[in-house]
């Protein structure tokens, strides 16, 4: 039973480390651009979009589709970078072991 007690302590320690890491990851930010920097999106480690900046030069009322595509591309890239950041940070805690459900 002593081994089980040690295992439980280690699990609690890992859980505390995980909670701390999730808080730290949530504070980190990534950004992505599209259209050569015409659209910039900022996202945090919780995959929440924080800001979208659009260069006025790209705004054309006759071609809204192009702007929509640029915003979508920048958002998707920012979210991809955020997921990658989470995996890298969690990999430090898990030693690179991919554990299902450990993402944020």
Task: Give, region by region, the residue ranges found by the protein language model.
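N-terminal intrinsically disordered, cationic/polar leader segments
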Residues: 33-53
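Conserved acidic
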Residues: 3, 63-70
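Short, well-ordered turn and helix-capping elements at secondary-structure junctions
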Residues: 29, 36, 56-58
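Stable alpha-helical structural segments in soluble proteins, enriched in small hydrophobic residues
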Residues: 70, 74-82
């Amino acid at each position: 039973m002593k081994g089980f007690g040690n295992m439980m302590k280690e699990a609690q320690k890992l859980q505390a480390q995980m909670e701390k890491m999730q808080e730290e990851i949530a504070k980190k930010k990534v950004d992505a651009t599209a259209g050569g920097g015409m659209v910039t999106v900022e996202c945090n480690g919780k995959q929440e979009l924080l800001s979208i900046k659009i260069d006025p030069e790209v705004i054309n009322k006759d071609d809204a589709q192009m702007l929509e595509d640029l915003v979508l591309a920048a958002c998707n890239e920012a979210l991809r970078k955020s997921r990658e950041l989470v995996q890298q940070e969690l990999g430090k805690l898990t030693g690179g072991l991919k554990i299902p459900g450990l993402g944020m």
